[in-house]
Amino acid sequence: MTFAIPDDLAPEVYPLAWLLGRWRGPGFLAYPDIPERPVVVETEFTHDGGPYLAYASTTWLLDGELAGLDRPFDPEALAAGQLWAAESGYWRPVVGGPRRSAFGVVQEGSDTRTEPGGAEPDPAGRRAPSTEVEVLLAEPSGHVSVFVGSVRGPRIDLATDLVARTSTAAEVTAATRMYGLVQGDLMWATDLAAFGHEMQSYSSGRLARMA
């Protein structure tokens, strides 16, 4: 599906413009005490002209079998079963000022970045420019999370800076997320530290652009 940047999109949001639209596709989730199961995810990014994107995502258990994420699929044909999770919030690129990221630090007025694992930036500049992004998410399960990270070309890496929960919500202490645009599809993966377990893979999937 052809995508064009809206004329009224705020320039600050251009690094995230490729997320705009409605996405739907299959995935898998598994965690200690949660057997692996297929899911269907529907995600939408919208804008109102402000320097941010509005976001909403819903996950259902898939009513049917899923052979794998590398097979062709019809997003409309994926049958949603029991509701599993929902979340909504805002994605905001950080423009100007000191940059802070869960994956490294850039001092104000400097292009020197400490990369994940302590690696220095590519001196030849082969990597795409990086923009810091802040994400605020709320879930009806009783959790509110603040993610920080960066968008570099068609890839986004995020990690929680804060996870708050109500007194009745399950224990979730941290999470990381990766999003990438691959051959027109939105690939995603989530690692989670929850219920007393260390950070580990929780879910992943592949979404096709619907609109």
UniProtKB/Swiss-Prot annotation:
CDD domains: lipocalin_heme-bd-THAP4-like. A motif (GXWXGXG) lies at residues 21-27. Residues 104-130 are annotated as: Disordered. Gene3D superfamilies: 2.40.128.20. Disulfide bonds: none annotated. HAMAP family: nitrobindin. Belongs to the nitrobindin family. This is Ferric nitrobindin-like protein.
